[in-house]
Amino acid sequence: RILPVIGQGNHNAQIMFIGEAPGANEDKTGVPFCGRAGEILNLLLTSVGIKREDVYIANILKDRPPANRKPATEEITACTAYLLRQIAIIEPKIIATLGNYATHFILEKFGVPDSQLGISRLRGKKFPVQDPTTQNPYIIIPLYHPAVAVYNSRSLDELKSDFKIIGEQLKSAGDNL
């Protein structure tokens, strides 16, 4: 571990993006989504008229797992309270989960049935939830992780389509960033 990656963005954001864990670039800079996946995330945000500085970005884990392995249960446990506190402080209207792992984790934390379905079945759907502790309402929208487009350029169109759902949700709520 070089630097912890706590999170970054607007503390009054209407949208909070949550990924799994920092990668190598993030570990070096302390900035979430600053590598190739971050470039794609920026492109996707721009495609729906959202500025990166208007959102908040975090990961479940705050440190990169060694050798990019899946997070261990102990690591998740150590970071869960911090992430839930970040969500409560930011109070976003939308929580956009990036990838299978973050989607399963967040949907399960908020008690959503079928939270273990694959991301291809959950992506782009809206799950209205309420935080049992703070009573804050959120809409969770699972999305493919932007890194998918690094390995499969055809998936960029699916990602853009999913990001349109976020833009539409903001407009329907009367919130323009």
Residue ranges and their predicted role:
Residues 1-177:
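A polyanion-binding, active-site-adjacent surface
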